[in-house]
A protein has these predicted regions:
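Glycine-rich, basic loop-to-helix element that forms the pyrophosphate-binding segment
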Residues: 67-86
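Membrane-interface aromatic/basic loop that binds lipid-linked glycans or pyrophosphate carriers
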Residues: 116, 275-341
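Acidic helix N-cap motif at the loop->helix transition within catalytic regions
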Residues: 16-18, 45-53, 98, 102
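Short aromatic/hydrophobic "clamp" motif used to bind/position activated sugar donors
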Residues: 90
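Donor-binding/catalytic cores of nucleotide-activated saccharide
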Residues: 74-76, 95-206, 211-229
Length: 341
């Protein structure tokens, strides 16, 4: 068994993929301890040829899969998780990003030392921010073994993000729950990552950046996030995530925490994304969002967290929705929502 599996979807990254692959080949944990699963998502440039070249040079480390059609990152990652991952731990690294040589060894040793289900780490788009050696790193450990601790954990977004790239996951822990990414959409991660917040018992958080995140102007996410339908996909994935927690996990114990999460991600974030890109807030969309929110949270103002420190935007949005539910004036609501930044 390999110590670590790395899952990497690849699409039209000929300019960057060698930098990524070299950063994996040069890991101090050793190539014999790495399983690198590369899923080419029907690239139209030289990405497949580069993958084949590295696969030939490192046949015991690299497993390459070539999709005949583009199926997006969520489906690629699910294919890897369902069929190929065999390491003790696994992580996701994008094909236009890179990690320092100590990355996998440090995360593996830290996870083993603390018996961690998940390690949350930090990323940076500035290479100067990346810690030069593991001696520069510190971490905190969080143990969610009571309801109160879990609630505190769910309410503190600084501990764990919704990004899959910044996580190192115990395969035995994952096999117990078997979360999946949303498929066929651009904003696929929350359906996989948010349930981790409800289930991981031992979490380590690295305090310094160790993952280099490249802002690729030609990357899929940069392109997708400029499209109206992608923003709507974000909203629908958040609804799917809420329903998953409701159906499969203990939502009753953490109902108010999940409501707060839903207000923020389904409603507030969607409006912020649209406003930031100067996309229209149509009456049809806003009515739909209000209708779904009312179904999920019939008495939205009864949430005890609203108005407490750190929930200003949640309270503001809840007030707007509650006012609309009472007076039905969609024009007034849209004008208020346009002011959200």
């Amino acid at each position: 068994m390999k110590k670590v599996s790395v899952i990497t979807p690849c699409y039209n990254v000929e300019e960057y993929i060698k930098t990524f692959l070299d950063s994996i080949v040069n890991q101090t944990i050793g190539t014999d301890n790495i399983e690198l699963i590369l899923i080419d998502d029907s690239s139209t440039d030289n990405t497949p040829e580069i993958i084949r070249e590295y696969e030939q040079n490192y046949p015991d480390m690299i497993l390459a899969i070539f999709n005949e059609a583009n199926i997006k990152q969520g489906t690629c990652r699910n294919i890897a998780l369902d069929n190929y991952v065999s390491g003790e731990y696994f992580c996701f690294i994008d094909s236009d990003d890179a990690v320092p040589p100590y990355y996998l060894k440090y995360l593996y040793n830290t996870a083993r030392l603390n018996n961690a289900d998940v390690i949350q780490l930090k990323s940076s788009s500035d290479t100067d921010d990346i810690a030069a050696s593991p001696a520069m790193l510190t971490y905190d450990t969080f143990i969610c073994d009571t309801t109160d601790k879990r609630k505190d954990f769910l309410l503190n977004p600084a501990i764990m993000t919704e990004s899959c790239l910044c996580k190192f996951i115990n395969k035995n822990y994952y096999d117990h729950y078997h979360f999946h990414f949303a498929e066929g959409v651009a904003y696929e991660e929350p359906l996989f990552t948010h349930p981790i917040k409800h289930t991981a018992k031992i979490i380590c958080r690295i305090n310094e950046p160790i993952y280099y995140y490249r802002i690729n102007p030609n990357g899929t996410m940069q392109a997708y996030m400029q499209r109206y339908d992608t923003i709507c996909q974000h909203m629908l994935v958040q609804l799917e995530t809420y329903n998953y927690v409701k159906e499969h996990l203990d939502i009753d114990t953490f109902l108010y925490e999940m409501q707060l999460y839903f207000i923020h991600t389904f409603f507030y974030e969607t409006i912020i994304f649209l406003n930031a890109r100067q996309m229209p807030l149509t009456a049809e969309l806003v009515r739909y969002m209000c209708s779904i929110t009312k179904q999920i949270i019939p008495d939205i103002m009864s949430n005890p967290y609203l108005g407490k420190e750190g929930t200003y935007e949640h309270r503001e949005v809840a007030d707007y929705i509650d006012s609309y539910n009472h007076n039905g004036n969609i024009s007034v609501l849209i004008n208020k929502l346009k002011e959200l930044k």
